Amino acid sequence: MMGRHVRAHHSSLATRLDWPFVLTGVGLWLVFAGLMATIQIASPNLPSNDDFFHIKLAQIMREQGLRPPFPWLPLTILNEQDFFDHHFFYHVLLIPFTYGDLREGAKWVGIIFPACAFLMGWIFLHGQRVPYAALWSLGFFAVSEAFINRLIMTRVQAVSLLMLLLMLHVALKGRYRWLLPLAFIYTWLYDAFPLLLTMIAIYVATRWLFDRRLNLAPLIYTGLGVGLGLVINPYFPNNVVFIYHHILPKLMDNSDINVGNEWYPYETWTVVKNSGLALLVFFAGLFALGFRERRMSLEAAVLFLITLFFGLLLFKSRRFVEYFPGFALVFGAVAWQPLLTDWLQKKPAAAKILPVLLVLVLVPAIGFNLQGAREDLRGSSSYLRYAQASAWLVEHSSPGSRVFNTDWDDFTQLFYYNTHNVYMLGLDPTYMHQYDPDLYKLWRSITRGEVSESGQTIRQVFGAEYVITDLRHDRFLNQAEVDPWLQEVYRDEDAAIFLVLAGAD
């Protein structure tokens, strides 16, 4: 009796499954992953410096627990007492990739997660009944080389894009209650939840303009999810304090601090070159909206405003190239959906012509972007850059001793190879500036070679026993050569290490 019931249940489930949809999704995911793999195999290097940090911290979480102590940046707002992992759930997702070689695991992340994001894009387009949604979804590889370069990184942006598309899909389908748990997850995933709140606010406002009836339920569910994600958090209340410190400097024009390159805007022509097809698809979508005799759909209006929002952010900061091209493609596809559907109904022969035209556009654009992404990966920093210098420090320094690094963005690779020592600053220079502005300015002056006999200051103020620097800090190296408190003890083709002599105390 029980056996017949179980068999009947499985039979019913198999009947309910839309097998063409499932098989198409599996096939598309394999294509997406395969195309991403063609980029990753172009070089053994990782696409960005931050990749080293994320995969290493995930390994530490696997070995020491989901909230391990973080002693490695004691002179920043990420000191051990105040530490907050603002990519907490992302690092949890990385844990399965930390078994075995970490570098290879990081590369698999840069294949699997973007493929999942693009699959979500296809699900979204399929849900909007876009003709040839599968071909449109291949356009994610065509619209922007910079977009691809961002998503192959072992960083949160691919999962963030997936989650934003999923939550917009849920909102457009009217399943508002799902926004609460999804917003909760997103808040644990990434501290960019203001993007989510803005996106849902755009949806609510647009629906109000269309229906003349204000329904705040989507925004309330999303806000509750974000609020609960902040409060029911393993790092509360440190997370709230950190978010204030992290976001505020980016909103202010603080030219005194050189933050990461991704926070600065592109020149207009650079956007045209690296995301020209995304801009073309966006304006083609506008043309489609103007071409229709009937009023635009709610879905098209929402996507237009969201894409415009990310476009404005892109001209403020180049890091938003991880969102604008993807949403531009989705907007263009949804904007053209009614016209294409009508055309295919009136001219059935077009069903054979249209996919051919799409392929003729996609193939060269995809090939161009893949080749560009492969070349960019080959030009990235060698994954072995600080391997030997870090090994030397592990062997010759005491556990927990401080190392004065002369470049904040070297921290990630140093951390990857050497958690034996702790460092001055890393990930973002504002983390030390927010902790102690004067200390940051002193660190910067030393690294620029503006402080004579800096070894004494490095020992007394920063408490460091060693200094590690790349070989491009010429002015610092010139000062170090004549500094009686610094003794060079190691050098290779990438780095030099100095011992801070005990007499500097």
Residues covered by each model-derived region:
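Juxtamembrane membrane-water interface segments that cap and precede transmembrane helices
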Residues: 71-75, 85-96, 241-276
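Transmembrane-helix motifs of polytopic, lipid-linked glycan transferases
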Residues: 108-129
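Membrane-interface alpha helices of multi-pass inner-membrane proteins
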Residues: 144-147, 165-170, 177-192, 200, ...
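Membrane-interface transmembrane helices that cradle and orient dolichyl/undecaprenyl
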Residues: 164-178, 286-295
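Membrane-proximal, lumen/periplasm-facing interface regions of secretory-pathway glyco-
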Residues: 345-396, 408-412, 427-431, 444-453, ...
